[in-house]
């Protein structure tokens, strides 16, 4: 797990190269519905690690997701962490959209009850600004689209009610 690694002993760029290669292998295998934590390693790596050298590898993952009709999870937990943005962030989500990606799910990584649904309203607004019109929930391994309406506008960031 990237959380436990000592980055003085491991080259972050080598780890990311292997990570994105394994993600592509997993998506090619395709026996799951939604890819979560695309940028998970960045939470724990040194802050000066750049993801831009992996643009081609990420594009390959995005294209495979689109071809396999596997959703990309947009996780709101980054808004309540030091990273300060969704995971993946806006630039990668825009690229996914540009490549034709429309199938998304949302999560909040609520490890405590108070975080349930936190920052989902902000995430919905961000996704609408990018052009996304819906997200999916899964029933019986089938995506069920839910409109990204304006129902969250003006809502508290930590509350869906």
Which role fits each region the language model picked out?
Residues 1-68, 151-161:
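Extended substrate/RNA-proximal surfaces in nucleic-acid metabolism proteins
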């Amino acid at each position: 797990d990237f959380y436990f690694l000592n980055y003085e002993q491991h080259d972050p760029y080598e780890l990311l190269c292997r990570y994105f290669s394994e993600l592509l292998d997993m998506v090619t295998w395709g026996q799951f519905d939604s890819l979560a934590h695309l940028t998970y390693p960045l939470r724990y790596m040194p802050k000066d690690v750049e993801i831009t050298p992996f643009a081609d590898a990420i594009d390959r993952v995005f294209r495979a997701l689109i071809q396999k009709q596997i959703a990309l999870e947009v996780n709101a937990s980054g808004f309540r962490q030091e990273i300060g943005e969704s995971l993946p962030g806006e630039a990668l989500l825009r690229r996914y959209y540009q490549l034709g990606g429309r199938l998304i799910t949302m999560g909040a990584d609520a490890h405590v009850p108070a975080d349930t649904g936190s920052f989902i309203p902000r995430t919905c607004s961000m996704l609408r600004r990018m052009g996304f019109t819906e997200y999916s929930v899964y029933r019986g391994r089938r995506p069920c689209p839910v409109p990204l309406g304006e129902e969250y506008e003006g809502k508290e960031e930590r509350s869906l009610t």
